[in-house]
Amino acid sequence: DLPDLQRELNAGVNHTMWVSAAYLLAVVVPLLFTGRLGDVLGQRRMFCLGVGIFGLGAVACAVAPTVEVLIAARAVQGVGASLQMPQTMSVINRIFARERRGRALGVWGVIGSVAALAGPLAGGFLVGHFGWQAAFWVHVPFVVLAIVLALLWVPELPTTAQSIDAP
């Protein structure tokens, strides 16, 4: 739990707040750009890259020797999440016919909501029984599974743009 993390990494409250803030900033700030990257370079490719970066960030978090390294690794995770997030909705919109798209988006939304509720509960259990590092190690098998399933089931869709224009 948080006191264990603070004790093991000799971190104060401000540093531990940055563990979450670094992740959130790294997710939100590049979102518009990362969505466009999917349009230009391909949604499946950007999804897999994002999941991979997220996974590498999770491993870096789990082995972080200092709170500063943990904060940086959380930012890496956030960049990975930012790369994958816009691709999911884009792929759903492109591969499902109009009459099935609403159901597909609904299932996607429900899965995301259940994960948002179950994640902290499962994380609390893991951290309570195995230490704060378990909250990061648990991502690794899901990262591998997500990449394998995306490569097997998500089609390589044609890109819709040829360049990224800067404003």
Task: List each model region and its residues.
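Transmembrane-helix bundle of Major Facilitator Superfamily
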Residues: D1-L152
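Helix-loop junctions on the cytosolic side of multi-pass membrane transporters
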Residues: V148-A166
